[in-house]
């Protein structure tokens, strides 16, 4: 029992000893970790103090920021191994501490911009604290990070090209070719030789525009687009060249990085900038066509504003500066703002002045589309070479530019086309005038009455009676406007009236004896009525005008001579018998055909293919009948052309039958008394055997 208790006691003490030992080891480990952290923090604090940053900033940096800034600073030492060196004019014996720092601070404040150094991989090795004034981003936030995180996506390819050396440098080592190393858009600066290493550095000038991220408030940010601001960057790309060591690899080139200064372009309030004595402003379209100049331009260049308007800016730029201006113009259209290089603006009378322009695309407040360009121009010099005229526009006398052969050929082709069009128009007008004259002559026919014959002319007014005409007396024909001529006359041409012939009264004639070569006409009684309705006073020719208006021929019995009547150039042969004849054509309202009978078996039939000018017979349309009120009569009207066909004549149909059918269909709404009167008139006229002899052509 006692031994058992002793064993338990020994185990308990051993366990306590182990626990104490473990606790001591843990305590020692904690102390070591604490000590290590303290030492680490101390080292980071010492490292932060070595950074070229104010103490107020370094005291608040975390470890990651200290490492990032330190790495960037060490890379900077490769670009500037000697720091400021002797370039600032200070002697080695002079205390350089606070004096140099104060000088650098004043330089940055005077710069009105920010300085930045970028490594070949895009890491920002250094950027001045003035970047926060222009971008709203702090120096600590930007340093050590990639510049591609803070520029527009469309500018990243351009930035890559700027940070890379020209390809021909690596292909042609300097020791072998002895060719200068440079860049197409840069200028090689004198190199600095390192006597210890036997190497030297070169500087390639770079000027470009970047759209960088801006987080400033809108009232302080100036002109921004989608959170990006245009920054004008100018600087140089540094490279170190190591000589050939004889191993066959040639010279070695090390890209050190880009050193540049960023300037903010004028804000969107560019139109509100106060113009000084050496400044003038203009507005232009997107193609640099000038649309406005302020009056100050006359004092600085000699031109009046009206002399410059509607001309392009390129006309007033020195030929050697046009390519640089073209590049600036492209940047302006692509990025919205640009600062041009110094260029020579040609002055009136000769010479030039040096000018630099700050141009901005001004947007319409109601839309996002670019409207015009506003440029503020700074005249930097007096007028130079006043007597040298480089462009005829400086003298105010502009010669016409020579026309290229292609332009001359195009002008000749246009002139030929215009002449052909004019000839075609004249021919069409002449044809139209001839056709109108032809129709007018056909309408305005003059008739000479054959002796021993009498013609009764029906007056145009309803209810008038015809009078016999004696031998040798001219015939007066009643005229009524033919509505079917409307579609064939121009609006300015007057409508020529159509002749309404009235047959003479001859009781001794018989329709049965004169069936060949004559038509029995019927419509005189319609003109002799005066009904209450408007269409009661209309003649048949007023309701259905003749198709060819009038073709009248007359002959004289004396000598058997011939007489010509106006009919569009047509002539009629006089018969030896001296019979007075007229040829009238009327539509058949029952069958749609025109029938004409004579001994030669000629008859009229509609042919839509016959030309109007050839057949001298115009088409008739039911729509031109202003008096037609019956749809049945409109369906019966024919609209084709009429032509003479030498065939066997069809069944004979007289106009008396046609007239009777027409009256029954058209005047069916009249009173029975009017119908009875019309039938009596028709019967009376049939008994009198009225006849018109219509001669064939």
From Swiss-Prot:
UniProt-listed PROSITE patterns: BHLH, PAS
Biased composition (Low complexity): 506-518, 621-631
Listed SUPFAM superfamilies: HLH, helix-loop-helix DNA-binding domain, PYP-like sensor domain (PAS domain)
Region described as Disordered: spans on this chain: 496-537, 554-584, 621-655
Compartments, record wording: Nucleus
Quaternary structure (record): Efficient DNA binding requires dimerization with another bHLH protein.
Listed name of the protein: Protein single-minded
């Amino acid at each position: 029992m006692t031994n058992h208790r002793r064993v338990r006691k020994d185990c308990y003490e051993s366990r306590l000893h182990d626990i104490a030992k473990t606790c001591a080891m843990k305590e020692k480990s904690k102390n070591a970790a604490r000590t290590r952290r303290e030492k680490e923090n101390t080292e980071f604090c010492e490292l932060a103090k070595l950074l070229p940053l104010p103490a107020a900033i370094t005291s608040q940096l975390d470890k990651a920021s200290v490492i990032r800034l330190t790495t960037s600073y060490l890379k900077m030492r490769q670009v500037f191994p000697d720091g400021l060196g002797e370039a600032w004019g200070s002697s080695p014996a002079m205390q350089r501490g606070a004096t140099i720092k104060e000088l650098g601070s004043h330089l940055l404040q005077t710069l009105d911009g920010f300085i930045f150094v970028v490594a070949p991989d895009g890491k920002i090795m250094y950027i001045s604290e003035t970047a926060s004034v222009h971008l709203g981003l702090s120096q600590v936030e930007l340093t050590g990070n990639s510049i591609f995180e803070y520029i527009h996506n469309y500018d990243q390819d351009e930035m890559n090209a700027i940070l890379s050396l020209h390809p021909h440098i690596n292909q042609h080592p300097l020791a072998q070719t002895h060719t200068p190393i440079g860049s197409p858009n840069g200028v090689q600066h004198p190199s600095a030789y390192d006597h210890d290493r036997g190497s030297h550095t070169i500087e390639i000038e770079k000027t470009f525009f970047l759209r960088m991220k801006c987080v400033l408030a809108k009232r302080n940010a100036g002109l921004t687009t989608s959170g990006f601001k245009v920054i004008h960057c100018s600087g140089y790309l540094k490279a170190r060249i190591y000589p050939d060591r004889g191993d066959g690899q040639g010279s070695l080139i090390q890209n050190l990085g880009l050193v540049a200064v960023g300037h903010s372009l004028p804000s969107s309030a560019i139109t509100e900038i106060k113009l000084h004595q050496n400044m003038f402003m203009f507005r232009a379209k997107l193609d640099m066509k000038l649309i406005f100049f302020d009056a100050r331009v006359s004092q600085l260049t000699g031109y009046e504003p009206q002399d410059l308007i509607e001309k392009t800016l390129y006309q007033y730029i020195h030929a050697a500066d046009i390519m640089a201006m073209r590049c600036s113009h492209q940047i302006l259209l692509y990025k919205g703002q640009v600062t041009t290089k110094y260029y020579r603006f040609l002055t009136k009378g000769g010479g030039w002045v040096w000018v630099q322009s700050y141009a901005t695309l001004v947007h319409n407040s109601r839309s996002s589309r670019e409207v015009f360009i506003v440029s503020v121009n700074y005249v930097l010099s007096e007028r130079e070479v006043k007597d040298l005229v480089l462009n005829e526009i400086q003298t105010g006398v502009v010669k016409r530019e020579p026309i290229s052969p292609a332009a001359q050929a195009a002008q000749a082709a246009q002139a030929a086309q215009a002449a052909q069009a004019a000839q075609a128009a004249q021919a069409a007008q002449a044809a139209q005038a001839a056709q109108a004259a032809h129709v007018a002559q056909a309408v305005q026919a003059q008739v000479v009455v054959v002796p021993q014959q009498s013609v009764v002319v029906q007056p145009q007014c309803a209810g008038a009676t015809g009078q016999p005409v004696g031998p040798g007396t001219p015939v007066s024909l009643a005229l009524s406007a033919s509505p079917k001529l409307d579609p064939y006359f121009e609006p300015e041409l007057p409508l020529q009236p159509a002749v309404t012939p009235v047959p003479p009264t001859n009781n001794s004639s018989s329709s049965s004896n004169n069936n060949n070569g004559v038509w029995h006409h019927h419509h005189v009684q319609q003109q002799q009525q005066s009904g209450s309705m408007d269409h009661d006073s209309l003649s048949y020719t007023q309701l259905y005008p003749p198709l060819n208006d009038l073709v009248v021929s007359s002959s004289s019995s004396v000598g058997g001579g011939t007489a010509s009547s106006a009919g569009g150039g047509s002539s009629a042969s006089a018969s030896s018998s001296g019979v007075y004849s007229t040829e009238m054509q009327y539509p058949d309202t029952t069958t749609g055909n025109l029938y004409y009978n004579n001994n030669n078996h000629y008859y009229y039939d509609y042919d839509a293919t016959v030309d109007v000018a050839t057949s001298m017979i115009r088409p008739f349309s039911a729509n031109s009948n202003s008096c037609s009120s019956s749809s049945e009569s409109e369906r019966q009207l024919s609209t084709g052309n009429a032509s003479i066909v030498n065939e066997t004549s069809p069944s004979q149909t007289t106009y008396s039958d046609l007239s009777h059918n027409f009256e029954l269909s058209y005047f069916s709404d009249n009173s029975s008394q009017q119908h009875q009167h019309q039938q009596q008139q028709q019967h009376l006229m049939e008994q009198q055997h009225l006849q018109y002899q219509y001669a064939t052509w």
